[in-house]
């Protein structure tokens, strides 16, 4: 007894041929061992040749017959948004561009996300790949959601987020836990359902519980408004694994590159702070010509060496002091997590201690930036020895008081203005639960500018006190902070308190950009990932 079987195959594009073969049913077992299965490897994308994107989407949607029309539309809309160049597939550029427009998923995860989405031997994501990723990732996220949802009521609230993070070794206070909930909550219910959780975490490539907690902690709580004011927090696990020193090294290298590249702006600023007056009308352009004529191109980097050298001791001391002060404050509170204001206070205190320790290097930086050609022939240590011999130990702490007083106003005003602008944005743009990246950058820029405007007069007085002994025209000026303020207001008016602020603002964008790019590169090379 035999039966005829038809096996379809595609040849030459659309030509369909039927191949007939006789199968002896007595030897069906032997035959089965020789038959090639229909699908022996991962599917190949159907978007090939002249097949349109719409036709490919329709074909792949038909393969997932269990999807509802609403779900299909949601996946299709998301795929279209990610496919920035509309070429029918998603590559690394599409993902990076899409994530850069998201307020909560960092663009740095784009390579890992692409790896999770694409087929094994491809560098692009087809609609079929994306659909498979969404279905599988949402299933894994549902499992994570069930673990967080302790009372199984279908909603995750602040207490459950707090408990979940504690289980992963991260203690959060109520304010921080609620911050995470608010970022995910789309309905304003102060809790998160499964759909909201899946939507929020869909483009974050990991469902590992530890990774997700790190992502929440470093991207949903601490944002750009606090950068530079409060040192980075590290969990006990990160301290033990060495993540902390990798981030400090990355920050040090980034700071060195940023300061070196923007050193000319810094030297112009210092020169204008000390030498610009109402009568000589010395400006940025005339200052550039003057400095170049005196010492050439290299003169614009005077004082940069010690400015770079002081990064390491200052960063290390600030980190250690911040960690110790935090522990004391937490012990005083009975182990509770610190609030934002308390962290700001701890960070400012750590900054004050580290500034006190390295302040002599700050004074030397100012004097080296103002030196003339030939005044450093015997090296930096000889330069410091000359200062000590001529003026005594006190010279290394000239301008210390205005420097110390400038720390808290800058940090406090920066953070206050930032939070106020964020609140105003969400109040007037109610359709957005959280500001986007551009809005956050605008808030951060405005708050930083306000902080600088408030603290700049103190910085100017500090610089003049540091340079008073080596500046003949300033040697008759008062040797105290209050005396300097009175002298400037009487002789130059209110605008005299802002001499040199133009190059200070000019260096902000290149300094931040260089620092961010270098930090990310070095951090990745060292394997210090916390998101």
Swiss-Prot record:
Assigned protein family: Belongs to the mitochondrial carrier (TC 2.A.29) family.
Solcar repeats: 242-328, 338-424, 435-525
UniProt-recorded name of the protein: Probable calcium-binding mitochondrial carrier F17E5.2
EF-hand domain sequence ranges: 70-105, 106-135, 136-171, 172-207
Transmembrane annotation, as ranges: 248-265, 303-322, 348-361, 399-418, 441-458, 500-517
Stored Pfam families: EF-hand_7 (PF13499), Mito_carr (PF00153)
Organism taxonomic ancestry: Eukaryota, Metazoa, Ecdysozoa, Nematoda, Chromadorea
Gene3D superfamilies the UniProt entry points to: EF-hand, Mitochondrial carrier domain
UniProt key word Nucleotide-binding: no
InterPro entries in UniProt: EF-hand-dom_pair (IPR011992), EF_Hand_1_Ca_BS (IPR018247), EF_hand_dom (IPR002048), Mit_carrier (IPR002067), Mitochondrial_sb/sol_carrier (IPR018108), Mt_carrier_dom_sf (IPR023395)
Record key words, sorted: Calcium, Membrane, Metal-binding, Mitochondrion, Mitochondrion inner membrane, Repeat, Transmembrane, Transmembrane helix, Transport
Residues that coordinate or bind Ca(2+) 1: 83, 85, 87, 89, 94
Residues that coordinate or bind Ca(2+) 2: 149, 151, 153, 155, 160
GO cellular component: mitochondrial inner membrane
Places the protein is found: Mitochondrion inner membrane
UniProt topology in membrane: Multi-pass membrane protein
MF annotations from Gene Ontology: ATP transmembrane transporter activity; calcium ion binding
Keyword Transport: yes
Role noted for this protein: Calcium-dependent mitochondrial solute carrier.
Family matches, as CDD domains: EFh
GO biological process: ADP transport; ATP transport
Species per Swiss-Prot/TrEMBL record: Caenorhabditis elegans
